[in-house]
């Protein structure tokens, strides 16, 4: 936890503390962290080569004392390539092992996979936060609050939940929908009747028209998807993007505040 990391940082009294995690293939993540398992003191960071240096890597969560600013040059400076190695060389950098799951998220596909990983974590640790599997009855569908406030989300008649689904209490789902698996629906989203959602993330204020399908994609704030439209192939809709009816989107990245009424069948960026 972050509180545990902060308490550990205050206890050792040095300049920095970083979270580290153990991975099966450290070569995929750049440098390994060589550390003392007894104290957590970091000895050095090493590039992956022919010599094995362990499976611990930088998890990207840092806590520093204010004196860190004295060590950052007044020029473009890399924290990972310059500052952290110098702290380690001066015995001023400690590590704390991450409890729980971790994933490196840099690309849309990784965000979608990370969302599934988080929902799986909720299934184990806080199952009441997820929608209950099964069908809706025009009310709460037998679901919990889905992490929102103000009661349970509304599922329309004959709508069903499959697998892990996190839905804010202010969102609504129409009749005859199939939601899941691995779907997150943010606040004030409106899902029309007959919609199919799977392996996707809908941020706040998204509206999906009747009979649309969204698979393996991310819909940004206040985006709208027209009726009978299909979004798939790791497509990303920026904020305030509006798709017309009967449009097919496959692997498209659409920048914010765009309106699109034609299909995009090959991966590309729409500016």
Describe the predicted segments one by one.
Residues 1-4, 110, 196, 213:
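Residue-level recognition of oxygen-bearing side chains
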Residues 53-57, 185, 237:
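A short, polar/proline- and glycine-enriched secondary-structure boundary/capping micro-motif
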Residues 19-20:
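Generic beta-sheet signal
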Residues 142, 147, 193-271:
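Glycine-rich hexapeptide-repeat left-handed beta-helix
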Residues 3-11, 23-27, 36-126:
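Catalytic-core segments of class I nucleotidyltransferases/pyrophosphorylases
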Residues 29, 59, 162-163, 168, ...:
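Short loop/turn microsegments at loop-to-beta-strand junctions
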Residues 88-205:
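Extended, small-residue-rich solenoid/repeat segments and analogous flexible loops
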């Amino acid at each position: 936890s972050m509180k545990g990391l902060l308490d550990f940082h205050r206890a050792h009294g040095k300049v920095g503390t970083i979270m580290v995690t153990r991975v099966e293939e450290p070569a995929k993540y750049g440098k390994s962290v060589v550390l003392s398992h007894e104290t957590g003191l970091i000895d050095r960071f090493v590039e992956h080569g022919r010599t094995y240096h362990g499976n611990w890597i930088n998890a990207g969560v840092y806590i520093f004392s204010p004196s860190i600013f004295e060590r950052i040059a007044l020029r473009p400076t890399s924290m990972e390539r310059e500052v952290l190695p110098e702290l380690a060389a001066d015995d001023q950098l400690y590590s704390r092992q991450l409890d729980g799951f971790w994933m490196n998220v840099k690309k849309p596909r990784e965000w979608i996979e990370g969302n599934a990983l988080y929902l799986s974590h909720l299934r184990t640790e806080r199952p009441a936060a997820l929608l209950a599997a099964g069908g809706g009855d025009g009310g709460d569908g037998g679901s919990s609050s889905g992490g929102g406030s103000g009661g349970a989300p509304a599922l329309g008649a004959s709508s069903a939940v499959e697998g892990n689904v996190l839905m804010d209490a202010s969102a609504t789902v129409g009749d005859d929908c199939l939601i899941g698996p691995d779907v997150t629906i943010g606040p004030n989203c409106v899902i029309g009747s007959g919609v199919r959602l799977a392996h996707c993330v809908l941020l706040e204020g998204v509206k999906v028209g009747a009979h649309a399908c969204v698979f393996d994609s991310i819909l940004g704030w206040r985006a709208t998807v027209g009726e009978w439209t299909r979004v798939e192939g790791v497509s990303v809709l920026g904020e305030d993007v509006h798709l017309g009816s009967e449009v097919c989107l496959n692997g498209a990245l659409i920048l914010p505040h765009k309106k699109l009424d034609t299909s995009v069948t090959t991966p590309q960026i729409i500016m």
